[in-house]
UniProtKB/Swiss-Prot annotation:
Its main location: cytoplasm. It catalyses: Exonucleolytic cleavage in either 5'- to 3'- or 3'- to 5'-direction to yield nucleoside 5'-phosphates. Keywords: Cytoplasm, Exonuclease, Hydrolase, Nuclease. Coiled coil: none annotated. Its EC number is 3.1.11.6. This is Exodeoxyribonuclease 7 large subunit. GO terms for biological process: DNA catabolic process. One of its GO terms (molecular function) is nucleic acid binding. The keyword Transferase does not apply. The gene is xseA.
Length: 447
């Protein structure tokens, strides 16, 4: 064969051809194996090797898928992956491009259960303080379960035995599979919104952990927490504990036990009804007695306030007031007559004419005494005034001047008492008994 007739592949072309062959032959497959060489760089992608006792294969799980995992992969874990077979052309290595990874076996479910349980417990969804009491005598029971399963048959059997008259409203849901958890949560929300029943039973028969997994979903736990009606969980057998059991207001070991807890015994109910009947009769009797007593009181008050009775009372009161008015008028009249007599007697003794005569005589006497006193007082004042005038004249400067003396003053009007107050040639003024003189100092003598 000539060289030109050969179909020669480049390395790149070969790897691309193998890549297309692998991807076309193995579109999506499930592979189980043990993790090793787990690596998670800063990019967020996950790289690891999947191996068993005879072989190994490289795997890549990209970041957008890795973020959806419910566990943290580690070396030695047994896992199940859903992947496409591919080839990394630059190195010629074939690998698995993983789209989903889960832990293999019940161990994975158990770890997921514990992680969710711890997270919800930290949020307080399981706190005893939020658990609500069950109604002692419910009017209607709601049951969320499969309409064809053994759980509903067991519940209805218990209800027929304990209390046949208790109506049960069934909310049919699937209790296993991918659609179960959303359907159960929606049934809880519907029952809470409608409020057609007083208590709810969430029930399912026994099964494996995987069979019961719908009752371990977070969406169901939160729907129970948000439900406004008390919820009793009766899922599986006594050894089975689900997240729904922990979130419910009360957990029952089985669906039958849940029905026992929420339904009263017929005899107990009848006893309760009889007790309520007696209480009602007693209350009615007390009420009737109370109303009868009120009626008697009203009749007595009506008799006391009857118009005829009131008119009689008013007539008696009018008579009494008339008698008291007559006595008061007589008493007042006698008092006025007595006072008038006293005033007349006093008037006779105190006649205005006599009083006027006495006043005129006293006035004349007082006039005489006043004139005499005024004359004597005026004479005394005149004598004192004359003496004061004589004394004043004796000390008056004018009198001194009249005896030949004079008063010298400076040109400024200052009285000169000492020769040192003036100088030779100073002008001085001399005041005489009559008139004034203007003088000039010719000579000054000291001492």
């Amino acid at each position: 064969m000539a060289v030109t007739d050969r179909d020669i592949f480049t390395v790149t072309r070969l790897n691309q051809a193998v890549q297309g062959l692998l991807e076309g032959t193995f579109p999506l497959i499930w592979v189980e194996g043990e993790l090793s060489s787990v690596s998670r760089p800063a990019s967020g992608h996950l790289y690891f090797t999947l191996k068993d006792s005879g072989a190994q294969v490289r795997c890549a799980l990209f970041r957008n898928r890795a973020q959806l995992m419910r566990f943290r992969p580690a070396d030695g874990m047994q896992v199940l992956v859903r992947a496409r077979v591919g080839l990394y052309a630059p190195r010629g290595d074939y690998q698995l491009i993983v789209e989903h990874m889960e832990e293999a076996g019940d161990g994975a479910l158990r770890r997921a259960f514990e992680e969710l349980k711890q997270r919800l417990e930290r949020e307080g969804l399981f706190d005893a303080e939020r658990k609500r009491p069950l109604p002692r005598f419910p009017r209607r029971l709601g049951v969320i379960t499969s309409p064809t399963g053994a759980a509903i048959r067991d519940i209805l059997s218990v209800l027929r035995r304990r209390f046949p008259g208790l109506p049960a409203l069934i909310y049919p849901v699937p209790v296993q599979g991918a659609a179960a958890a959303p359907a159960i949560a929606e049934a809880l929300r519907t029952a809470s919104a409608r409020k057609d029943c007083d208590v709810l039973i969430l029930a399912r028969g026994g099964g494996s952990l995987e069979d019961l997994w719908a009752f371990n979903e977070e969406i169901v736990a939160r729907a129970i927490h948000d439900c406004e009606i008390p919820v009793v969980s009766g899922v599986g057998h006594e050894v089975d504990v689900t997240i729904a059991d922990l979130a419910a207001d009360l957990r029952a070991a089985t669906p039958s036990a849940a029905a026992e807890l929420v339904s009263p015994l017929r005899d107990e109910w009848l006893l309760h009804v009889e007790r309520q009947r007696r209480l009602l009769v007693e209350r009615m009797q007390r009420g009737l007695q109370h109303q009868a007593l009120k009626l008697d009181n009203l009749e007595r008050r009506l008799r006391q306030q009857h118009p005829e009775r009131r008119l009689q009372n008013q007539a008696q009161r009018v008579d009494e007031l008339e008698r008291r008015l007559a006595l008061a008028m007589q008493h007042r009249l006698r008092h006025r007559e007595s006072r008038l007599a006293r005033l007349q007697d006093r008037l006779q003794h105190r006649s205005p004419a006599r009083a006027l005569e006495r006043l005129e005589a006293r006035e004349a006497q007082l006039r005489l005494r006043l004139d005499s006193a005024l004359r004597r007082r005026l004479d005394r004042f005149e004598a004192r005034l004359a003496a004061a005038g004589r004394a004043l004249h004796s000390v008056s400067p004018l009198a001194t001047l009249g005896r030949g003396y004079s008063i010298l003053t400076t040109a400024e009007g200052q009285v000169i008492r000492d020769a040192s107050q003036v100088q030779v040639n100073d002008r001085v003024e001399a005041r005489l008994g009559k008139g004034r003189l203007s003088c000039t100092v010719v000579t000054r003598y000291e001492g």
